[in-house]
Amino acid sequence: MDIALKEKTDTEMVFVVSGVTVPFINAIRRICMMEVPKLAIEYVNMYRNDAKMFDEVLAHRLGLVPLAADPEFAESLKMPEECDCEEYCSECSVSLTLRKKGPGVVYSGDLVSETPAVKPVYPDIPLVKLGDDDELELEAVAQLGVGREHAKWEPTTACAYKYYPRIEFSEDCDECLECIEACPRDVLGEESGKPVVVDLENCSMCKSCVRACDKRAIDVGYEEGKFIFRIETDGSVDPKDVLLKACDILRDKAEQVITFCEGG
């Protein structure tokens, strides 16, 4: 198996992996989405809400606010099902408070965490509008969870792969260049009067170029066992950490099967 990193930011990672099968790469994708733990608001204690918005709606909005947590702090928290408490405690949760008086808009940045290790990723997410003399006071309790339980715990906003494209020109090409105009993603270009591939990895294999070529001189396909994998997050977890954790989870599952087969 070979892996080549193509792009990496705080919220996105793109890499090319070859020498693997669809079931393997799809297992990584599903674990990234559904089984990698992430911190999100689970409980809201509403002490005062004068806004023209139901408590339940506001609580739902709070649950979808992305929270950035220091990796070491997040690792120290217990999963709720592993904790001995009834609902939440300091070992499995972190508290955020919000107090604001109108008029004005309440933003995610108004949430004050009990620890500097946890804070909203984006401070400018509008939550609710307060009128004159309206007040809002609440406590939000964040816990670890996984995406299969609720979308708010999904660390990825997009996690997908596609086959690595392949484009070939035959000797029948009459250099009409119609294929270049037909390509919607600027994958093809011109060089010395001939069509050439200039951005292969951007190809979606839509075959618009094939349909535009009367000579059928273009063959568009994919390389077997080679994929372009893209991970995007909401900023709460680094995409590299998501991938590493997903691999750890997959390895643990495989080791459990091995132990079972060996009769352990």
Swiss-Prot record:
Keyword line: 3Fe-4S, Cytoplasm, DNA-directed RNA polymerase, Iron, Iron-sulfur, Metal-binding, Nucleotidyltransferase, Transcription, Transferase
Q: What's a Gene Ontology MF term here?
A: DNA-directed RNA polymerase activity
User: Which of this chain's residues are annotated to bind [3Fe-4S] cluster?
Assistant: C203, C206, C209
Name its GO BP terms in alphabetical order. Answer: DNA-templated transcription
Q: Which cofactor does it need?
A: [3Fe-4S] cluster
Q: Which Gene3D superfamilies match?
A: 3.30.70.3110, DNA-directed RNA polymerase, insert domain, RNA polymerase, RBP11-like subunit
Q: Organism's domain of life?
A: Archaea
Q: Which InterPro entries match?
A: 4Fe4S_Fe-S-bd, DNA-dir_RNA_pol_30-40kDasu_CS, DNA-dir_RNA_pol_insert, DNA-dir_RNA_pol_RpoA/D/Rpb3, RBP11-like, RNAP_Rpo3/Rpb3/RPAC1, RNApol_insert_sf, Rpo3/RPB3_RNA_Pol_subunit
Kindly list the places in or outside the cell where this protein is found, as annotated in its UniProt entry. Cytoplasm
Q: Pfam families, per this entry? A: Fer4_10, RNA_pol_A_bac, RNA_pol_L
Q: Could you tell me what reaction this enzyme catalyses?
A: RNA(n) + a ribonucleoside 5'-triphosphate = RNA(n+1) + diphosphate
UniProt-listed SUPFAM superfamilies: Insert subdomain of RNA polymerase alpha subunit, RBP11-like subunits of RNA polymerase
Which PROSITE patterns would you find in this protein's record?
A: 4FE4S_FER_1, 4FE4S_FER_2, RNA_POL_D_30KD
Subunit structure as annotated in this protein's UniProt entry: Part of the RNA polymerase complex.
Biological role stated in the UniProt entry: DNA-dependent RNA polymerase (RNAP) catalyzes the transcription of DNA into RNA using the four ribonucleoside triphosphates as substrates.
Membership in a protein family: Belongs to the archaeal Rpo3/eukaryotic RPB3 RNA polymerase subunit family.
What's this protein's name? DNA-directed RNA polymerase subunit Rpo3
Organism encoding this protein:
Methanothermobacter thermautotrophicus (strain ATCC 29096 / DSM 1053 / JCM 10044 / NBRC 100330 / Delta H) (Methanobacterium thermoautotrophicum)
What's the encoding gene here?
rpo3
